[in-house]
Amino acid sequence: MRKTIALGVALCFGAACAEVKSQDAWEWHDGSALPQEGRGFSDTATPYVRIPDRLRGNCSGAVWGLSRNSSGICYRFSTDSRQMRVKWTVGDPVLSTHNMTGAGRSGVDVYGWDEGTKTWRFVKGSRPKKTDNEISFPWTPGRPCMIYLPLYNEVVRFEVGVLKGSKVAPLPPRASGVSKPVVCYGTSITHGASASRPGLSWTAQAARRADVPFVNLGFAGSGKMEPSMVDVVAEIDASLYVLDCLWNMSPKLVEERFEPFVRELHRRRPTTPILCAEDCSTFRDRTEKGIMAEKIVAKLKAEDPVAWKDLHFIPNTEQMARDCEETVDGCHPNDCGMRQMGIGFGNRYKQILGLK
């Protein structure tokens, strides 16, 4: 009798699974129609790139190429579907590199809101094996969802599937009340190297910690504060600008570009706070350029304490512990280092923006 009941339950469960897996049971929503965050410009060539064609002349060749990567772009929505599927296609067949996993470079990352802890919790990652990929997972109807796009690859297609008849809706405004993004301009570390998956980049972790949207303008090896890049950064109406470029700059470049860049950004957005970040290293004490940058910030604040009251500096001691365990190569943070940076920057966001 027990065997008969168990067999019946198994058959019913199997039939339900088969029905859900049937292509006819799904409705697909293209990324262009889903509630999206993290894209600083509405007129990009596709929904998955970071800088529009009209600003190509402001970018170096390297920055322009890297702006095709979807780092920081994410989707936030709720659905009453009990199961979801995600399909995406990346443009670069090189899915992983020496210091980036396939999941981080080319994968998507799914988070769900946990009402009990009031935090976003990891739900489903991905292991891309080719340029076309798909994942599926059960879902609690009504639970808020957030899906991060790949850090270091170009997305050419993105779709979310829900069971037919299910609704997909944007999330309500954040509890923090912050609607304008934190705009992070920087280097490969800002870009996301070397988080094992997109949701573990420090920019994503800091944003979740402070409950704010963010835009990622990190460009590997290319965060050099060129004067023309002020146009790109300042065009985005931000709640806070984060400048994390020292890793890619020599002392000479810091001397030439740091102060003019900060002054021009402040001139264009005089009421928006600016957070300048020191570079840091596992193996070295403070660098000459880090000390230079801190002195420039202090000089500006002394020059006019009222005008520059919202200019801030985050030292390396608030970013990584420098215990030799937080990087993959002595420079790029691993997940441990990314968490340390996410906490440090997230705490600063809350302090600067007056959040609890």
Where are these regions (language model features)?
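Conserved beta-strand scaffold positions in the cores of enzyme catalytic domains, especially
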Residues: 17, 214-216, 313-314
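A short, hydrophobic beta-strand element within the central beta-sheet of small alpha/beta folds
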Residues: 273-275, 318-319
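Conserved SGNH/GDSL esterase-like catalytic core that processes O-acyl groups on lipids
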Residues: 130, 143, 150-159, 178-263, ...
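Positively charged n-region of N-terminal signal peptides that target proteins for export
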Residues: 1-4
